[in-house]
């Protein structure tokens, strides 16, 4: 071993595995680009982003930590969201929650054929965030 050497596994790292997924269509109705980071509570994203906000409650983008999705003015794309894990408390952002997530408001798919997501896993579907949301 060489000092400072990093030895990694040759297997792929799965992120947000076994988290229910939701796919929504988002449109930037503003006149400036909007970027949303990986851990931002998507429900509280910029008001110029037009989407079904209630479906995004308690969720963040299903992308690697530190990454972001950019919406140019007029852009319309699908994004994949996953539920927050851990203590499920949200503070800051636009101040719309500031406390525990109200579980009764969290959208959860009812079956694998749900229009927006598969239940607990990708069921062979492709992560749409790599192109701009998840399609079977």
From Swiss-Prot:
Q: Which cysteines are joined by disulfide bonds?
A: none
State which Enzyme Commission number(s) the record gives.
3.5.1.5
The Gene Ontology terms for molecular function here are: urease activity
The record's annotation in InterPro entries points to: Urease_beta-like, Urease_betasu_sf, Urease_subunit
Q: Which Pfam families match?
A: Urease_beta
Q: Which GO terms describe its cellular component?
A: urease complex
Q: How does it assemble?
A: Heterotrimer of UreA (gamma), UreB (beta) and UreC (alpha) subunits. Three heterotrimers associate to form the active enzyme.
UniProt record similarity statement: Belongs to the urease beta subunit family.
What is this enzyme's catalytic activity, as reactions?
Answer: urea + 2 H2O + H(+) = hydrogencarbonate + 2 NH4(+)
| Compartment(s) of residence | Cytoplasm
| Pathway field | Nitrogen metabolism; urea degradation; CO(2) and NH(3) from urea (urease route): step 1/1
Q: Which HAMAP family match?
A: Urease_beta
What gene is it encoded by?
Answer: ureB
What organism does the UniProt record list as the source? Staphylococcus aureus (strain NCTC 8325 / PS 47)
Q: Which UniProt keywords apply?
A: Cytoplasm, Hydrolase
Annotated region Disordered: the residues are 113-136
State what protein this is by name. Urease subunit beta
**Alphabetical list of PANTHER family matching this protein:** UREASE (PTHR33569:SF1)
Enzyme kind, highest EC tier: hydrolase
